[in-house]
Structures are given as C-alpha cells and as structure tokens.
Amino acid sequence: MITSSRNPKIVRTRKLMQRKHRQRERLFRVEGLQALHMALEAGYEPVELLYCEELFAGEGAPSLLERFRKTRAELVSVERSVMEGLSGRETPQGLVGIFPFIDVELERLALEGNELIVVLDRLQNAGNLGTLLRTADAVGAGAVIMLEPCVDLYDPGAVRGSMGSLFNLPVVRMGDPEGLFAWLKEKGFRAAGADPYEGELWHRGDWEGGTALVLGNEARGLSADVRAFIDSWVRLPMVGKAESLNVSVVGGVLMYAWSMGNPVPGECA
C-alpha cells in the first residue's frame, strides 16, 4: 500500500491534471464509478488503477474493483489520505484509473451517412465539452469532431462532465476545416450551423438524414473559415433579456431536434 503522497506513482498521477504532462505521457485520469464502468463496458482498460477500499461506499466500488482485477491493469492500493489528496472530487469514491489516449482518425469512422455528427469549432470550456459529449452519446450521435485549437479532450473537467461518454462514441481531433467538410460532403452529410440570429428556428430546420451539427466557440461563435462551409443555419429564439445561450444548451436542444426528425423505432418521436 502506498502511504506517501511523494511516491512516484502518486506524483505522476497528480501531474496528469496538467495538459502538458498528459500530452507527454499520452495518459489521462478517470474518476467516478460510472465513468470507469462505462470504460470497461466499451472495452477500454486502464494501464493503472489506484484504489482505497476505506473510501468505498455501497457495493458498486468493490464489484468494480473485482472486474478490474481481471484486466491487465496494474492495481495499486493507496492510503486514504493519499487518495483524498489525489482526487479531484469533494467526496472521493476511492478509484482513479489511468488510461491511454484514444486516437480516432476521420478516415476510419464507420458511418452510414444518415447519422448525426457533432462538430465543435474551437470550443474552449472543458465543462461545455463534457456536457456536449454526454448529450451526443445520449442521442446516439455517430461521432464528435473537434476542430483545433480546442479545449483538451482529456481535461479533468471534460472527462468528469462526460460521465464516461467519451468512451462510448468516437471523438476525432483535427485542424483542417476544409478537409473535414469535403469529407462530410463526400459521405452525404449536410452541415447545419448554429447561429443566434441567422437561419430557421430550431423546430423548422431540415433535420432528416445525415447531419453535421456545427457549434462554435463560446465567445466568438463559428470562425469565418468554418462558416464558409455551412449549408443551412438554425437558431433558438430568445425573447427575454439574455444576450446569448450557453453552447452546451444550444447543442443539447439542436441534437434533440435532430433526434425528433430521426426517431429510433420504439422511442417517442
């Protein structure tokens, strides 16, 4: 059992809170029973799992730990004070997994052309990214594509906000808008851009079939080089005094607008 916060494993895990160390190690942290469970269900295994049984509450953590014992992950027991200092949560659940980066290339996406693709243009807030990933997963999106420079996919806030959804759908990171939209057009996807003032109201938009929903930067919206490739625009009405809506709220409403136009058999349309 590790009893010191100066142990090299603990120091390395703590450093993974910083982007430069994540990039150097190509590793990221995952906390939370749900996120770790989703990782296993999706076929991803950590290279290392730090755990503190003293912090386990209920049956979820012990049973999850037993599942991790059957993987190739290195299991490391740590003292309570060490885990509490290591955790990014107010109430640690006693498990921290260290996972390798998940690399997804655009050309390797297995899509049929009738899905929803969510394109994020230079998003900067980790919490927004996590929420959008979770919502995209919930509506059954085929992929999320992040146009760089974007917030780090593996930022602890994004990982926490996604609640494990980053393991459930492919996320592509790239910096070539022209190449992306040429690929989308070739695959039969229409690009629908979200704009606060331009285009059809959200419920009147053409959502049928393959759609790339393009969401912009929190402060500046869509960049000029991305706007040039938009096929149609959609907007949400604002009748109060608020000047804008959070991008994760806009994204959530528009993703479900697409879902209503493409209902899953057995679900409410």
PLM features: what roles do these ranges have?
Residues 192-242, 246:
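Active-site/ligand-binding-proximal alpha/beta "capping" segment
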Residues 97, 135-139, 153, 157-166, ...:
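Structured adenosyl-cofactor binding patch, chiefly the S-adenosyl-L-methionine
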Residues 41, 67-70, 76-81, 103-104, ...:
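RNA substrate-binding interface of SAM-dependent RNA methyltransferases
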Residues 26, 120-124, 235-243:
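Short pre-catalytic strand/loop immediately N-terminal to key active-site residues, enriched for Gly-Thr
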Residues 32, 124-131, 245-249:
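Amphipathic alpha-helical repeat scaffolds
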Residues 54, 148-151, 219:
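Short, ordered loop/turn segments at secondary-structure junctions
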Residues 1-90, 190:
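N-terminal positively charged helical leader segments and presequences
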